[in-house]
Amino acid sequence: MKIKIIKLTESAQVPRYSHADDAGLDLFAIEAQKILPGASALIPTGIAIELPQGTEAQVRPRSGLALKHSITVLNSPGTIDAGYRGEIGVILINHGQETFQVVEGMKIAQMVIAPIMRAEIEEVTELSATQRGEGGFGSTGYA
């Protein structure tokens, strides 16, 4: 599968896989930005993409940023639809207690390309019974 990419700025980096078996392509910041504790920020990547029909791109957090700095993608996963042609931006949130400094060229998120399925919606008056029923939100225990 081919993904077409346009660099919107000279400093933009084309997303790339760090390892042969990686699911996600690294996304890079094109500018420095501070994120205060508890705050969020839209970080530009300087790229736009063209996805094949029937696919989406999911923007996901980087585990190292989450573990070491409490930085994650706010709307995780963020969805990029095949018809979108604008700049990809990553909404990061700082769950930590210290200001986080995004630097130009930093890996800020990963982008996973996935197939989509379109559902046919059928409105009904009742749903079929299951063993689980309406149990949710911890109904199966904590362990």
Swiss-Prot record:
The keyword DNA repair does not apply. Gene3D superfamilies: 2.70.40.10. InterPro entries: dUTPase, dUTPase-like, dUTPase-like_sf, dUTPase_trimeric. The keyword Ribonucleoprotein does not apply. Keywords: Hydrolase, Magnesium, Metal-binding, Nucleotide metabolism. It comes from the Bacteria. Substrate binds at R62, S63, G64, N75, T79, I80, D81. Its cofactor is Mg(2+). Pathway: Pyrimidine metabolism; dUMP biosynthesis; dUMP from dCTP (dUTP route): step 2/2. Pfam families: dUTPase (PF00692). It catalyses: dUTP + H2O = dUMP + diphosphate + H(+). Its EC number is 3.6.1.23. GO terms for biological process: dUMP biosynthetic process; dUTP catabolic process. GO terms for molecular function: dUTP diphosphatase activity; magnesium ion binding. This enzyme is involved in nucleotide metabolism: it produces dUMP, the immediate precursor of thymidine nucleotides and it decreases the intracellular concentration of dUTP so that uracil cannot be incorporated into DNA. Belongs to the dUTPase family. PANTHER family: DEOXYURIDINE 5'-TRIPHOSPHATE NUCLEOTIDOHYDROLASE. This is Deoxyuridine 5'-triphosphate nucleotidohydrolase. It comes from Acaryochloris marina (strain MBIC 11017). The lineage of its organism: Bacteria, Bacillati, Cyanobacteriota, Cyanophyceae, Acaryochloridales.
